[in-house]
Amino acid sequence: AGGIGVSHNGNLTNSISLRNKLVEEGAIFYTTSDTETIVQLIAKSKRSKTIDKIIDAIFQIQGGYALVMMTQKSLIGVRDPYGIRPLMIGKLGNSYVLASETCALDIIGAKFIREVENGEIVLIENDELTSIKPFSPKKVRPCVFEYIYFSRPDSLLDNKTAYEHRKNLGKELAKENDLKADIVVPVPDSGNAAALGFAQHLKMNFEHGLIRNHYVGRTFIEPSQKIRSLGVKLKLNANQSTIKDKKIILIDDSLVRGTTSYKIVKMLYDAGAKEVHVRIACPEIKYPDFYGVDTPTKKELLAANKSNDEICEYIGAKSLKFLSIDGLYRAIGF
């Protein structure tokens, strides 16, 4: 594309067909990334201005995406027509900054201005921002997993931190709960805020019954089952003095494949827990998300293939409940 860099958060749903077409037309690909497909489309455009080449490209792609591009003279941000993936605008002195989350702006001392709107392109040149809206208006449909899991707790989503949204998820989960226990234990760090909201609403004791090694990354997004299983052992350890002989309500943000939940429940029982009741601060995940979440097939999703009782038995818990869809809507305000 001649002097352009592209960074991409999301997933293109028509990347394979676009790639095949480009290869037939003579394009040479150096990676398997769908981001390169976007670069190839920009390079192929016959338009003279870079911004017009970008518009040509994004009219051909489908999916959930937030793009940040740089040329020698400009910074460009693009958000998909439904706003599935977030993109934020900040200001540092007289200059503009683009980032997927507001916490990135905080770190460098930039002031959060606003989100890039769904279907909007922002062109920044000579410290001036121009808004371009090439798509017809669409209803915003952000990915709910940004609220549940992806975004860092201190990042803003709809003028509330992800932490506040997750506490609300825990509060709504507590409203649907009919069980009393000795302690509420989060799966760190993803379940921390929801567990706190849950415990506060029911006036129950909140305890860190699991201690996390922060030098190990997220197990949910690891590519293979073997690595995910090993990751749980390396990442978490039971705090025996806190959980021994206790009836526990274990709170996590979500249950996708069940790998992590099974290992954690076993870990708690091995450490002396009397009962482990699992409560999940989002509804059952039964269908794949092709817009950027690592759930490629229905076969991998536990809730798509087992009943609630079967999942409970599979993970080894005394009982299992998920937040209702209505509870999710109330918590996030959709």
Listing of model-derived features with the role each one plays in the protein:
Residues A1-E117, L123-A181, V187, E275:
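Conserved short alpha-helical segments that host acidic/polar catalytic motifs at enzyme active sites
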Residues V184, G191-F198, L202, F206, ...:
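Extended, hydrophobic alpha-helical segments in both membrane/secreted and soluble proteins
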Residues K203-I249, T259, K286-P296:
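Short, glycine/charge-rich flexible loops or terminal/linker lids adjacent to PRPP-binding catalytic cores
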